[in-house]
A protein has these predicted regions:
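Acidic/His- and Gly-rich active-site-bordering loop/insert found
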Residues: 3-103
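Phosphate/pyrophosphate-binding betaalpha-module
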Residues: 167
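Conserved small/polar residues in nucleotide/adenosyl-binding loops
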Residues: 170-177
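Short beta->alpha connector loops
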Residues: 53, 145-147, 172
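Active-site metal-coordination/substrate-binding segment of hydrolases
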Residues: 65-136, 141, 146, 153-158, ...
Length: 182
């Protein structure tokens, strides 16, 4: 575990730290998909995958919110994979090394993968957080956003039941290597 696991909200940063340890280049999302499926199984969360490789997880609404409309939390599994010329790093097998520098979460010599690792972490945290009151939630994790939106365009019919979509986004620009802590 890296020092980012001490940040708040703790669950989000712990999940992001775990996600940074899983290789997830575009078109090679098998390991992160396995991570997501294992996560769903471990936490008894209903899940489904489609032929494209997308994953959807579903949790019911909390007490008093069961009949509210379902909200879809969307994020993507893959990341931009770039490294400094002097960095020995294999995006197919190496974990991202994170650190905090002057209030910023950064990666050591590579892109951070906050786009959209932090979106995945936030969605997973929302599914688990017992203090969060919510209607039914669906968390959609799509493949290959960075190089073609393959997962979004190939989403299996009937995968989603929600009527409202909360699209995950970050304030990072493409290829940026850090995220500021607010």
């Amino acid at each position: 575990m890296s020092e980012i696991t001490k940040l708040e909200p703790k669950l989000v940063w712990e999940l992001f730290d775990a996600i940074t340890r899983v290789p997830r280049p575009s078109k090679k999302e098998e390991k992160i998909r396995e991570f997501l499926v294992d996560f769903a199984k471990k936490h008894n969360i209903d899940y489904q995958t489609d032929q494209t490789g997308n994953v959807v997880m579903r949790v019911p609404g909390t007490k008093g919110y069961e009949n509210r409309p379902c909200v879809i939390l969307q994020s993507h599994m893959d990341m931009v994979c770039e490294k400094n010329s002097d960095t020995a790093f294999d995006f197919d097998k190496d974990p991202i090394r994170t650190k905090i520098v002057d209030g910023w979460v950064k990666a050591e010599g590579t892109t951070l993968g906050a786009d959209d690792g932090i979106g995945m972490a936030a969605a997973l945290a929302a599914l688990l957080d017992p203090a969060l009151e919510h209607g039914p939630l669906e968390a959609l994790f799509t493949v290959d956003e960075e190089t073609g939106l393959t997962g979004a365009f190939g989403l299996g019919k009937g995968m989603l039941t929600g009527r409202y979509l909360a699209v995950s986004y970050t304030h990072l620009r493409a290829h940026e290597t850090s995220a500021h802590l607010v």
